[in-house]
């Protein structure tokens, strides 16, 4: 059974505090939007899909007990609070897309004279809760599509491991599993599907400095699932791909531009460069909500920069020389030219065909 990072019932929201993992499993109560903004900004919850779900559900929890005088006041509350939540971590596009969808819904409900303010509130709550269920279903579809794509490609290339009946070794970066989504995971969902098919020989995960999401979170999930797994340092990736017959790299995404350029956790770009050198397929696994067709390329993606302390300290212990300057971008952008395919819940697309394909899907 996969881990549960989000516990929700109408009027109640708790998130697994990922800052405490793997040493302690503790749930934090989110009572409203201010709590939601804080747990996202402090990275107690992280992962683009999970950020969107927690942000929207924090608003649902806040407005659930309230009695609004009229539909206008409810609409204003929804729009203002959602725009505020987007500011918690701006690189991840999922929160912005979810906010835009819910604001559009609120405006439509506001104009609908057939419903009153109470009905409007309940329709809004239903919509936010539907996002939670959809995320899990989308992740399972991503897992199935990704596993199929990897197995088909490596079978053609003859990169399955001898004597393992078509099983593969894969590498992943950061955390993209149940802890980063509503459940199952994106890139780690692909790994999970390979395991369910009996086709996962081994998974390697990077430590993912400076926040150590790979060492703290992905390793935690892999041990929990009892998958055959090995943790490697970020600086070991080139040696790993040269020595260990890795069949594919699969990572997540915080924002994908319309040309396929992908913003993901810092370190992703260099892994893609190394994978290209070693002729290892490099896949991005992301829901359609992570694809931003309004952005033409990666140069237009805003990259969040984090505090120096995340680099200079581990917990309360300083590991860097006092007085040293730090540069700590949370994400980098991998050019589309390094990406083999973008795995979504609706299929796997080459970066060059992404914009046209997604536009058609959204119009259908």
Swiss-Prot record:
Pathway: Amino-acid biosynthesis; L-methionine biosynthesis via salvage pathway; L-methionine from S-methyl-5-thio-alpha-D-ribose 1-phosphate: step 1/6. The active site is at residue 254. InterPro entries: IF-2B-related, IF-M1Pi, IF_2B-like_C, Initiation_fac_2B_a/b/d, M1Pi_N, NagB/RpiA_transferase-like. Gene3D superfamilies: translation initiation factor eif-2b, domain 1 (1.20.120.420), Translation initiation factor eif-2b, domain 2 (3.40.50.10470). Its main location: cytoplasm. The record marks 174 as: Transition state stabilizer. It is an enzyme of class 5 (isomerase). Its EC number is 5.3.1.23. One of its GO terms (molecular function) is S-methyl-5-thioribose-1-phosphate isomerase activity. It is found in: Cytoplasm; Nucleus. It catalyses: 5-(methylsulfanyl)-alpha-D-ribose 1-phosphate = 5-(methylsulfanyl)-D-ribulose 1-phosphate. GO terms for biological process: L-methionine salvage from methylthioadenosine. Keywords: Amino-acid biosynthesis, Cytoplasm, Isomerase, Methionine biosynthesis, Nucleus. GO terms for cellular component: cytoplasm; nucleus. Belongs to the eIF-2B alpha/beta/delta subunits family. MtnA subfamily. Catalyzes the interconversion of methylthioribose-1-phosphate (MTR-1-P) into methylthioribulose-1-phosphate (MTRu-1-P). NCBIfam families: eIF-2B_rel, PRK05720.1, salvage_mtnA. This is Methylthioribose-1-phosphate isomerase. It comes from Drosophila sechellia.
